[in-house]
């Protein structure tokens, strides 16, 4: 089945439209008809009525006007695109791409990178320009200084150039650096000297500690009960030796005479003993050097007060009581053996040997125990 609109196709159009409509109305009685019947109707038409297609008819004009009205905007876009493409072909772009989307994106990226590179280059140029400006300003200041100096020296009959001024400045800087180096070397040498002094002080303090330990050990060997009688006996023997021989008072002579009278003979000196005897005083008994020294406490301010009186090596001044006659029986008779040491040893000392000799108070020295 074919619709009636087929009649309006260009194949059935002719110049005499009225005749064609009459013939169609005679043969076509309904809206639809079979195709074969239409073919018969078309074949019955005369040949002069089918001279070819005619584009000047009213239907085509209607179609063209509708198309122009509806697609006016599309036609304007097409014309603009054609104009742009024509202009691009005439004036080639600087990027050199073919107009595709990927190429355009790449070109935009490259343009951005190029702009960033241009920014970096501009920043570098600005920094270089600032550096050059600072250098030029420094040179101008130096030139001003040199001109002022030259004017001042020209009045006084002198003349200086910029090179001489710079040379003097460099010499001053070198002298300042040399002084700083010498000061640093002096500080380092002073630190080394202070370290050496500190080591020497430590060695001296250790020697003092050893000496105090030896003195403490020698004092501790004598019992408290025998300290005061021993001191009195030593002084009496010294007084007797002085009256008999006429020699001045020396503690080591007193110790020798006391040992001879008590019948105590010292052992023969050995090599180690002789070496130690040279370092220590002559009054130290030999039995005190053979035994090791015990550990002592730290040195204190009371060590000088505990030193026995027989350690004094300088002679006492002469007095008027030197010509007194000492009874010999007090010097020759030994003291009785004492009891074990106790707190009341000083009170139990026999007074007959202490009070029998009229010693002068300046000559009488009692140890502090």
UniProtKB/Swiss-Prot annotation:
Region described as Disordered: 325-346
InterPro entries linked: NPIP, NPIP_N
Pfam family, one: NPIP
Family: Belongs to the NPIP family.
Protein name (record): Nuclear pore complex-interacting protein family member A2
Organism: Homo sapiens (Human)
UniProt lineage: Eukaryota, Metazoa, Chordata, Craniata, Vertebrata
